[in-house]
A protein has these predicted regions:
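Extended alpha-helical surfaces
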Residues: 1-177
Length: 177
């Protein structure tokens, strides 16, 4: 089992309510020369969302699937869609159902997204418990960095710009009909 004491010690502490320290690309560049080739490819798979056989990634990907299926089921129920394809017959977890329910009840889409990001963050914390200087610690860091990168896209300016663009498109469509 490889240990990456120096690399992990040089990484900044990530906090969900903190800033994005650097991009996932910068992280991969940093890792390229300091981890084994096999572990580097594993980190790439983690960040791309590609299926992997590593137990840590399998557990996280299974968790993501459970969250996504719960989102589909609860959204379809909210829209009164009864197609069996929307039903979640897979594994379920109470905290996932509760968080998804809370997120879908939010009027503010940003708050809903932050609830879901927090759910993922906490799960990564659980998975990485007792992993400090190994590949699991780096995988957790990479996936948290990816979550922070996603969160950094939620800016007021970009949100307002997107709203104006959509509103303008609707106005144009109404004017043309």
């Amino acid at each position: 089992m490889a240990s990456y004491y120096y690399l992990v010690a040089t990484l900044p502490t990530l906090r969900l309510d903190g800033p994005l320290s650097f991009s996932t690309e910068t992280f991969l560049t940093l890792c390229k020369t300091q981890v084994s080739e096999r572990h580097y490819h594993l980190l790439c798979k983690a960040l791309s969302g590609e299926k992997a056989s590593h137990p840590f990634l399998k557990a996280y990907q299974h968790f993501e699937t459970m969250v996504n299926k719960e989102l589909v089921e609860q959204r379809s129920r909210k829209l009164s869609l009864s197609d069996p394809a929307y039903r979640n017959d897979a594994d379920k977890e109470g905290r996932i159902s509760d968080t998804v329910r809370q997120a879908l009840a939010q009027e503010n889409v940003l708050e809903a997204e932050l609830l879901l990001l927090t759910l993922h963050w906490k799960f990564l914390d659980e998975l990485a418990t007792l992993h400090t200087f190994d590949i699991e610690a780096l995988l957790s860091f990479a996936l948290k960095l990816k979550l922070l990168q996603r969160k950094s896209l939620f800016t007021r300016e970009e949100g307002n710009a997107e709203f104006k663009r959509l509103f303008s498109n609707i106005q144009t469509e109404i004017a043309n009909n």
